[in-house]
Amino acid sequence: MKFALLHILALAACACAFGKPYYVSSSGGSDSNDGSEAAPFKTIAAAPSENAEIFLKRGDVFYGAISGFKNCKIGAYGEGAKPVICGLKIVKNPAAWERLANDVWRIDLTKPENFDGYFAEGKRNNIGAVYDMAKDKVYGHLVTRYNALNAYGDFWVSGEVSRVNVQDKSENFRYLYFRSKENPSSGGAKIAFSTSGVGISNLENCEVDSVAVKGFGVHGVARAWGCKFRNMDVDLIGGSVQLGYPHWVRLGNGFEFWVSDKRPCSNNLVEGCTVSRTYDCGATIQGIGDGDMLIENVKFVGNTFIRCRQAFEHFVRSRKGTAKYSDCEFSSNRSFEAGENEFSTPEARDAALLSYEGKPVSGLLVKDNFFWGSSVYSNQTHTAKMESNTFYVFGDQYLVFNRYKPEAAIFADSENAVEKMRAFLGNDTDKIFIADRGDFSLLDRIISERFKGSEADIRRICKIPEKSLLESLRFW
């Protein structure tokens, strides 16, 4: 009786906090329904954007980004896989591909009859990656001009074949060009494109739980204030060109909390999420402004990062004022092979951690994390406070690297280098081990012991065979 009463009180408190519940099913709903579990809406847009609980049906896919919710809880109901907020534009008509010279194929992105999924238009066709859904394979190497389509799997997007370094805001992104021996949609392939956009953005005082985000070319989650993000899967993020930037550059983070001098994205928690295959970092606190800047209470706790360019990136810089963190942390997370992000664009900054801090950092703690198979820190001048982290680094990777002072790099080539790194970090609680890329037994043990619950995701994404095959490869 006591338990039942407590349960009723808990439900009442939840209803008071977020308001009336609404249910949404893309596979079995209708926007003319009342939004009850028995008669769900079809689209998220049909539900209120303020003071509501919004439950998305498990196993369903919701195409297009969501934005602008306030005082809401967004969760899942039913059985099966997490509901997916998806930005993928899916080729349904293989004949839409036109073969050009030198094994280059072209598809017109403006023809809705040739696509399923999210039909992006205009600058949303600033494609971040080409993705074979059937093989779970990413083709992420975007070239800067048509005549740079040199390797199979390269792609380029523009309305004019003569364009170079597509970054101008006037670009219309009409055609996607892809180099392939055969029609890209042949042989059982199911080709899709990650479209330019942010999966979830502009949330205030919201909770998002047990929802997946996939296939957006800008960020997975960004621009949030006072929010909690739990048990989410964020995959295949980034790669779009940053339009209007002074030079050609791509972008794309899993979770980004931007710091401005007017409205910093403070008071956010990301917990128990899995972030994979991001063009840039899995998680970041970053920002540049003119006035005084303060970011408070942003925490990444207990998350898993798989093949992101970096697991965590941080920088807060003010041109004319102060820039500070307060009570921010990246703790108890685990990262697998940061830097191997599958976008085929290796850079010197590929590492577990990335800092662009120009001044000493306080109020930001990196603690109790586990990193496998990546360089440690790409650092400009100052690191965050480090405590009790564990790094397994391959012998051909670095421990710290500053692109402005490459001569000061410390490479993972000896135990003496490890001691130098300890001195650089200024603490003796971090553990650093130099690992052999060919040590498959260690790899298997790390996956099974340190990445419990994520073993299948790691083996699928990284194409790692099961233990028995690993052992046979080592034997031969």
Regions found by a protein language model. Name each.
Residues 63-66, 195-201, 216-223, 234, ...:
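Short glycine/acidic-rich loop motifs that flank beta-strands on beta-rich extracellular proteins
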Residues 63-73, 80, 92, 316, ...:
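Predominantly extracellular beta-rich ligand-binding scaffolds that present long acidic/polar faces
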Residues 6-14:
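Bacterial N-terminal signal peptides
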Residues 23-223, 238-252, 256-258, 412-430, ...:
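Extracellular polysaccharide-degrading/modifying enzymes targeting complex plant/algal/animal polysaccharides
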Residues 58-59, 77, 88-90, 216, ...:
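Low-complexity, Gly/Pro
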